[in-house]
Amino acid sequence: MDSSSFIQFDVPEYSSTVLSQLNELRLQGKLCDIIVHIQGQPFRAHKAVLAASSPYFRDHSALSTMSGLSISVIKNPNVFEQLLSFCYTGRMSLQLKDVVSFLTAASFLQMQCVIDKCTQILESIHSKISVGDVDSVTVGAEENPESRNGVKDSSFFANPVEISPPYCSQGRQPTASSDLRMETTPSKALRSRLQEEGHSDRGSSGSVSEYEIQIEGDHEQGDLLVRESQITEVKVKMEKSDRPSCSDSSSLGDDGYHTEMVDGEQVVAVNVGSYGSVLQHAYSYSQAASQPTNVSEAFGSLSNSSPSRSMLSCFRGGRARQKRALSVHLHSDLQGLVQGSDSEAMMNNPGYESSPRERSARGHWYPYNERLICIYCGKSFNQKGSLDRHMRLHMGITPFVCKFCGKKYTRKDQLEYHIRGHTDDKPFRCEICGKCFPFQGTLNQHLRKNHPGVAEVRSRIESPERTDVYVEQKLENDASASEMGLDSRMEIHTVSDAPD
């Protein structure tokens, strides 16, 4: 063998072993260079691991100089503890009732693999409900109170759900039917809540009964509406402090969710299945098509092409778009559809769209990226950089530091405006005395103090936005205006002095 040749070897488990050792160091509190505070509870971690696992930490401009960070968006410390463990191990165990909390936290931290897995869990909930169980409960609901609402506690309300991402070499391989490994221990609190709720038939005589399953969490409640053996919506009841605020934009269309009133409670309905909601279908139903006489036929004609969307915008902290008038029209449209009203009655309905252009425009209202939404105020953005700059205001991040005095700012333009006070950059000039000032406010004070009564000075103040072309053009206009005024005054003077 040649002594200059290279010998290569590969240890497949080395990377996972390094992460495992880092996790042991984290649990022991050794060599940790940052402390993340969640609701006052500290969590020690390594910046490199956080930055490699979460784009939120990676794009944090001041992370390299910080020794501590507080995140107020995540309300449950246990949720962040599981997500932090996931960064080191690639595994996470969560209860089904906490999926919404994990989805909200993962969306804020931009952990895409957790977001996709939580969304997949919500979409696959309908596979845990047997159609035969629903039919049997409708007949013997009074005989078997523990199986009311057509749900088996032991098969649906599971305690930990195991999540293993594809890149985790130690994770278990998912089965063909589902990616969830569920224990069969039922929750007593959930079972008692199911017994108290009972099943409710909200439809008319010709409609399909709806069975509600209450999922109780720490901060949210969800109603899963079962229609025609498919869960098509997740309805999240918001607390008073977390209620979505009114907005000028509508939540209908391709956002995948809307707001409505259920039993006097305002809820946010989210499409999680492969079928759109029946309310949205009633609004976009074509006039030329044959109108179904019941909800079952309406669901039969729904399209399968509606993709599920990100759930971030519909849960706590997200600002839901709503218009109550449209919700009333949609409700009346659905009632007319269930009662088998003819096309003339639907045309007389104020909520029915008679024009194909209106129906086409309805599906394209207010498009935006659901994942670029501020968790604090619900404002949506088109670019990630705009969201990052906006989040600095809520997080108190001040990456722009003045090199003269050390004062910190959240935006670069604020720092540039502040630096004018330290340098000779004085773009605001007084037209009366020629003195220059670094700020517009300082110039205004100078005018009020030293040049009172000058009404036209403010309109002639030069600002940094005005170019030399603008100034030259304005001087030419002023000169021509003065010549015209002089000519008119001379003409008047000549006429008045003329002999009779």
UniProtKB/Swiss-Prot annotation:
It is found in: Nucleus. The modification Phosphoserine is found at residues 164, 463. Residues 32-96 form the BTB domain. One of its GO terms (cellular component) is nucleoplasm. It holds the Pfam family BTB. Residues 164-209, 236-256, 341-360, 478-500 are annotated as: Disordered. Keywords: DNA-binding, Isopeptide bond, Metal-binding, Nucleus, Phosphoprotein, Repeat, Transcription, Transcription regulation, Ubl conjugation, Zinc, Zinc-finger. The keyword Cell wall biogenesis/degradation does not apply. A zinc finger (C2H2-type) spans 372-394, 400-422, 428-451. One of its GO terms (molecular function) is DNA-binding transcription repressor activity, RNA polymerase II-specific. GO terms for biological process: negative regulation of transcription by RNA polymerase II; regulation of cytokine production; regulation of immune system process. Expressed in several tissues, including heart, brain, thymus, skeletal muscle, small intestine, testis, kidney, placenta, peripheral blood cells and adult and fetal liver. Residues 193-202, 236-245 have a biased composition (Basic and acidic residues). InterPro entries: BTB/POZ_dom, SKP1/BTB/POZ_sf, Znf_C2H2_sf, Znf_C2H2_type, ZnFinger_BTB_dom_contain. There is a cross-link at residues 235, 237, 426, 474 (Glycyl lysine isopeptide (Lys-Gly) (interchain with G-Cter in SUMO2)). May be a transcriptional repressor. This is Zinc finger and BTB domain-containing protein 34.
